[in-house]
Amino acid sequence: MKNIKSILLGFVLGTIATGIVVWNVMPGMMLEERLSPYSVDETVNKIKENAISKGWAVPSVKPLHKSILKHGGGKVEPVMLVNLCQPNHAFNILSEDDNKKISVFMPCTISVFQKSDGKTYIGNMNAGLLGSMFGGTVAEVMAEVSVEQQAFIEFAN
């Protein structure tokens, strides 16, 4: 009986420890950040050019910092949201009814922002990891998206 309690306690503690590690590590794996050698505007333009050259559309570039200020939130350093869409990838995911909820992650967004140090940074979601959480078609498509998006921002590596 004592051995069973010890095994059960070890299992529970191991599960809790694993949960704590995953909880603390996942944000760093899901969201990526890198320093850009260019200004905010130059970085946005490079990303747009690279995406378009690879068959992606750029539906919009939104100056989030201006919207925050306009609506009374105060002044923050520049934050630009570059919205990107590859129509075939979007179709392959959204043509399946069970995947329509994935539309909350669309269009793909790369952020370009300036921190208080005056430097420009690029932020993006790890599309491959996101896709693997859903499996199936979403995982297949998002694996491709991940590779393609890295090519848009390779100048900052």
Give the predicted meaning of each segment.
Residues G19-K62, S67:
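Terminal, regulation- and interaction-focused segments at domain boundaries
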